[in-house]
């Protein structure tokens, strides 16, 4: 594979691929994402991230070594594997947020870890996390955050439902209580205990306050129609 180095990354990609064609733009985007994540979280890794840009999900699995097709994932502590071709570009904030945030801690709850990554992503299928969450509340698809804190339950739900909710909840936590409180919670292993200690509320109480906040907003009917169509297209069941 060919390589390209920027300040905080070493990119690996195949010759003649879309990644090779776009590598300077990819590097510039990832450096911008990296700087923003570090600024928000108040931490900067002391290593260069090894970023493998693959032409297909199958190539991700082959290069990683388990031959399990995947669009993208972070191999902690310092590696990211992502599909990049003309149809799919799995670059941006998400996996980089995992790599940077894990220099602080790796909380036990996947909903918290993925919620932070989705906080930086802001959108799922180009629609805001908050819009998805409000739509799920309106249509009876919403899953309470206190239930999502259980990993088995979280991973049993479709990511198109669980991830935007977790991202919107993280956004609300940070905007309502501040980044320092969030960092204090994130640094602990047990999330329910950390929530009680840092926020003075149980996960269920925080979820109730979050739901009340989400209900303050309305989503345009055309956006709701687009969300419904996307869920049908991807055969999503809450």
Please state what every model-predicted region is.
Residues 1-2, 236-238:
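Short, solvent-exposed mixed-charge patches
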Residues 60, 65-73, 80-87, 103-237:
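Acidic/His/Gly-enriched intrinsically disordered linker/tail segments
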């Amino acid at each position: 594979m060919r390589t390209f180095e920027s300040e905080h990354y070493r990119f690996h990609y195949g010759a003649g691929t879309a990644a090779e064609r776009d590598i300077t733009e990819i590097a510039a985007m990832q450096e911008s994402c990296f700087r923003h994540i570090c600024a928000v979280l108040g931490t900067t890794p002391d290593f260069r991230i090894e970023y493998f840009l693959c032409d297909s999900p199958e190539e991700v699995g082959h290069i990683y070594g388990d031959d399990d097709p995947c669009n993208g994932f972070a191999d902690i502590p310092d590696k990211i594997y992502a599909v990049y071709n003309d149809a799919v570009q799995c670059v941006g904030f998400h996996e980089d947020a995992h790599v940077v945030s894990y220099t602080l801690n790796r909380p036990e709850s996947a909903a918290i870890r993925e919620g932070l990554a989705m906080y930086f992503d802001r959108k799922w299928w180009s629609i805001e996390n908050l819009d998805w969450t409000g739509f799920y509340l309106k249509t009876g698809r919403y899953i309470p955050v206190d239930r999502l804190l259980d990993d088995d339950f979280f991973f049993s739900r479709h990511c198109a439902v669980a991830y935007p909710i977790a991202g919107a909840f993280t956004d609300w936590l940070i905007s309502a209580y501040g980044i320092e409180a969030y960092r204090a919670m994130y640094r602990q292993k047990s999330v329910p205990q950390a929530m009680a200690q840092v926020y003075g509320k149980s996960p269920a109480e925080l979820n109730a306050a979050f739901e009340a906040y989400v209900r303050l907003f309305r989503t345009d009917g055309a956006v709701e129609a687009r969300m419904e169509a996307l869920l049908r297209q991807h055969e999503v069941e809450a």
